[in-house]
Every structure is written in C-alpha cells, then in structure tokens.
Amino acid sequence: MAGLEVLFASAAPAITCTQDALVCFLHWEVVTHGYYALGVGDQPGPNDKKSELLPAGWNNNKDLYVLRYEYKDGSRKLLVKAITVESSMILNVLEYGSQQVADLTLNLDDYIDAEHLGDFHRTYKNSEELRSRIVSGIITPIHEQWEKANVSSPHREFPPATAREVDPLRIPPHHPHTSRQPPWCDPLGPFAVGGEDLDPFGHRRGGMIVDPLRSGFPRALIDPSSGLPNRLPPGAVPPGARFDPFGPIGTSPPGPNPDHLPPPGYDDMYL
C-alpha cells in the first residue's frame, strides 16, 4: 500500500477518531485511482487546488465529511460524502457528469483500532478487505457506470439523404455553365413519392402520374412544334414540362390508346 503511510503521517495530527482514520484511508484509495482532491464542501471554493493530500478542514465535521475530487485528465469529478451513524460509516459517491451514485456502509470497529490511532501500523485492521470493499463498492461501479453512460449516450445524427423526405420547394443545385450536368439523378427517399408533382421547376424525376413518354426507356425526341405552320419560340416549353404536341408526332412511338379500356357497362346486354 505505497503512499498510505506517507499520507497518514501528514494527516496524523488531525486524526482524533476512528472516522477520521477511515476517511484518510478512503482518500488514499481514491487518489490511487487517478484522482486529485480539490477541496471540501458541495460547491467549489476560492481555495480549491489539485492535491494528493487531504484538503484543509477535511475533518471539521466529525459526523459529515464532504470532499470533492477531479480525475487527472479532468474528464470526471466526484463528490464524496462520509456520514457517521453510531459505529458505522456510510460512504456515498456522486459522479457529477453522469449523475451516477454509489454507496457503501462500513463498520468502523471492523477496520479501525480506536486504541492506536497514533500508530499507523496498528490503526488499520483487515486493510486488504477494507480496500477491496471500497474498490468493489464505490470505485468500480462509478467507473463502469460512467463508461457505460458515455458509450450509450445518444448522439444526434441526421439520416442520409436517401432516407429523408425531399423538400419540393428546395433550390436546385447550381451547376456552372462551364461544367456539364452530372449524369445521375439525386436519389429519392421512400417517403418522397409524388414530391416531384409539387416541384414547379419540373426536374427529370417523375411524380405519381404515370407518363409513358418518360418511362426511362430510350425514345425519339418529340418536336413540340409538330402540326404548326411555324416553330415555337425558344423557351416556350419549359425543360421537363409535360407537353402534348399540337400535331402528329411522326415516326415516334404512338401514345397510349384512349380506348384501351372498355366503356362502363359494356357487358350489360340490357344497356
């Protein structure tokens, strides 16, 4: 137990009861696990400083000890309280960041010899058992809960573009005139069906209306001026607009037959 004897020697003049000796042992165990003492009390004070020694005034109240600690890398802070209840001491530890709590109850007579508080070699009884109980009852639970809270804490992540609903009023991506348009279309999310029907710019994607002329298969270009004596001026038909030519479309594949469905009641012989 390297360091405990040195700590005990520095605090020996202030150790006047069994609970003082137990808090001294608890402090040493916390420090050996990478913590520094900051000060006493629930709230930070102007005299706080990192130290491996017990802070000034650590045992002013023999019934309630309140110490604050900070991990060596500053990642976590502990609030340690030791409450004396008759011949027992209740140890309570709070980790500020995760708000995790651990507690342990110890019988003072099992680990402290009240008759030899001035002799380090005789003050502590069953020191290995005492150390094991502090580690398993306080240190390990706090560390495990802190690590678990950090691993399982939710991180806000936006879903990928393919899983988000497409905003029909968004501004289309800008492509300089000197560069070519990319040959691919933006992927649509599963909940964006029909969104293109609301897009006034009429991009290359389809909506909910079936358009055989835009089914994705190769087809001949349609001249919107077909059947007119003169050609339509440039820009008369917006790009991507659903436009029916004024006249026959020549050798292009014919459109859907308007009579491909039977009229209502065609099979009623009495109609």
From Swiss-Prot:
GO terms for cellular component: cytosol; endoplasmic reticulum; perinuclear region of cytoplasm; proteasome complex. InterPro entries: PI31-like, PI31_Prot_C, PI31_Prot_N. The keyword NADP does not apply. The modification Phosphoserine is found at S153, S252. Residues 251-265 have a biased composition (Pro residues). The keyword Endoplasmic reticulum applies. The modification Omega-N-methylarginine is found at R205, R231. One of its GO terms (molecular function) is protein heterodimerization activity. The modification N-acetylalanine is found at A2. It is found in: Cytoplasm; Endoplasmic reticulum. The modification Asymmetric dimethylarginine is found at R219. Residues 2-150 are annotated as: Important for homodimerization and interaction with FBXO7. Belongs to the proteasome inhibitor PI31 family. Monomer and homodimer. Interacts with FBXO7. This is Proteasome inhibitor PI31 subunit. It comes from Pongo abelii.
